[in-house]
Amino acid sequence: MVVASDSGRLAVILNRAEEIVPDPGTILETRGDLVLASVSGHSVPDHPRTAAFNLVEVAGSRVTVTSWDGMAVRRIELSPGVHMIAHHDLDDPRTARISRWLPEFAEQSRTELGSLSQSAWHERWIGVLARSAELGPADDESIIRDNRAHGYPTLSLLTCLAEVSADAVSFESAALPTPGAWSDPTFSPG
């Protein structure tokens, strides 16, 4: 995640399930450059030389998801509301944690968030994360992940809260004391 708080931009990149495996010996560029370019106002090229990804870009009130599957770049502008994305498509029911938790996040958002204090908004969403962690970090429905059981050396490392307006980004993060294991977060300004 990269934040440009002065320009109201935020970008998050997620690894995407590879639909086309690159040829052996192919040298791929880092996906990290894409988030840096995004917060500077640059678009993803039509044929990135990276592994597959989903890039979430926030610029003021506009939110876009750009996906690269190794064959084509797709861009979707999000409608207002609650959405989830992981290693497949936006709001994709193929992802167990999206099927399980998207309705609960949406339910927690039914009260007009603008009428809630910042701490109340945070508590609702952190509560959903905590409930998901009760399943265990290797469970397909869990949001806080330890994917080593599935053959991937990836673990959840932190929890972030971001609020974006037309002119600024407010960002807080909390590192998980033990990667892949939930604990009550203590947030610090980013």
Where are these regions (language model features)?
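N-terminal nucleophile
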Residues: 1-190
